[in-house]
Amino acid sequence: MLQSTLDPNASAYDEAAATMSGKLDEINAELAKALAGGGPKYVDRHHARGNLTPRERIELLVDPDSPFLELSPLAAYGSNFQIGASLVTGIGAVCGVECMIVANDPTVKGGTSNPWTLRKILRANQIAFENRLPVISLVESGGADLPTQKEIFIPGGQMFRDLTRLSAAGIPTIALVFGNSTAGGAYVPGMSDHVVMIKERSKVFLAGPPLVKMATGEESDDESLGGAEMHARISGLADYFALDELDAIRIGRRIVARLNWIKQGPAPAPVTEPLFDAEELIGIVPPDLRIPFDPREVIARIVDGSEFDEFKPLYGSSLVTGWARLHGYPLGILANARGVLFSEESQKATQFIQLANRADTPLLFLHNTTGYMVGKDYEEGGMIKHGSMMINAVSNSTVPHISLLIGASYGAGHYGMCGRAYDPRFLFAWPSAKSAVMGGAQLSGVLSIVARAAAEARGQQVDEAADAAMRAAVEGQIEAESLPLVLSGMLYDDGVIDPRDTRTVLGMCLSAIANGPIKGTSNFGVFRM
């Protein structure tokens, strides 16, 4: 049973909470832009036509009063495209079955797909495939964003390949077509197992009337060329003919109810709430990430009953490892305690990951690391081979991994703690997180040392003012590029979450993971001893 020494009345807590709240406000301001879609003008126009927005459709599709875990909501932040990438993706329960829902937003440039839309769809498909989640596509899209077609067309074929591979793996794919599904978009219903179209609303064709006339000289209209009734009566592309949007959603729910879906993972044990208040998670991470904090304070507020069986507590103490349950699901946890990873921590992590694979237990990585230790003594002591051992174990582990960046995640430590490149099933960040090859001060300092050495080799004087300006510019650049808003916009995580929602988000992830089998491995790469 974990104990807590966190004092919510302390000034350090107040400062940390105020800083985190400020960062949350900044995140929420950007999320509001995604929620607004194309803005009041286009949303009102959409409603005036009798249509629902994608989030309204999702709300009616998922079970009443059940949560919806939205993924990649900040996609395209910092780009020339609307935040959210004209697409809503996430996991929700439909008739008790956890599904990946992918919904075009027609209020944003007609729901056309830009490069960030494609990345977001592919990430959603990857999550669905890895976790065995049925996919429901809520289709209303004008196809590719033509000005950026060179970035979309060639890689874009993967989203259709994904649908067929999902189907081949026994993972159902369902398309509810609410409006236009043209050109390449026509292959979304074409590649789906179940297709619902709406009377006088759904339009599915490879080429619209103007293009058909130009190519063949044939005169046609939307309805005769690709309307719902034609596809239901003649082409056979539509499996179900809905009268309106609500009817289409009703039919979609009935399709899911008839899937006879059975989870292949373990059933959860009875759930007990943590002993400590989740609201206090907002005041744990110091404003200055160089100040260490105890990750057990986080663990105590997210795991069932605040019960945590720590593994090797006296060895490699900069990394906390141990076993717990979260929303009833067994879980192994690796959490950075004092930033730097030494040889002992690397060996400890490697053994722990092997044990988790032996026990078929998912792993949660809580990031707050500046990387692996450097220096002559540590190089001689085998830091490279021990760090490589940990990365080897993370790379070849086959139990599901979830990563949560709560503080720093720098250098190869990001890799060893299962960063994005190591394919965690889910990766989220707190607003306090930062991730880069190294801290801004360190990187600018390295560049300064190199520049000074080069100047001395040429027999030149160092321009101190220019050096100071360079260091300030580089430090500012790295600081900006390491922030969660920027990284989330690039889809390097699956979302930036409120720390107080951590237990709920992780519980939903573990429940989604349990749709597929959980099986560890004993087949790791060669460990260099």
Curated annotation (Swiss-Prot):
Protein name per its UniProtKB record: Probable biotin-dependent acyl-coenzyme A carboxylase beta2 subunit
Keywords annotated in UniProt: Transferase
Enzyme Commission code: 2.1.3.-
Family per record: Belongs to the AccD/PCCB family.
GO biological process, one term: mycolic acid biosynthetic process
Sequence ranges assigned to domain CoA carboxyltransferase N-terminal in this UniProt record: 20-271
Domain of life of the native organism: Bacteria
The protein's role, per its UniProt record: Component of a biotin-dependent acyl-CoA carboxylase complex. This subunit transfers the CO2 from carboxybiotin to the CoA ester substrate.
SUPFAM superfamilies xrefs: ClpP/crotonase
Keyword Transcription part of the UniProt annotation: no
Residue ranges of domain CoA carboxyltransferase C-terminal in the record: 270-520
EC top class, as a word: transferase
Assembly: The biotin-dependent acyl-CoA carboxylase complex is composed of an AccA protein, which contains the biotin carboxylase (BC) and biotin carboxyl carrier protein (BCCP) domains, and an AccD protein, which contains the carboxyl transferase (CT) domain.
Classification via InterPro entries: AcCoA_carboxyl_beta, ClpP/crotonase-like_dom_sf, COA_CT_C, COA_CT_N, MCCB/AccD1-like
Protein induction: Does not show significant changes in expression throughout M.tuberculosis growth phases.
One Gene Ontology term of the molecular function aspect: transferase activity
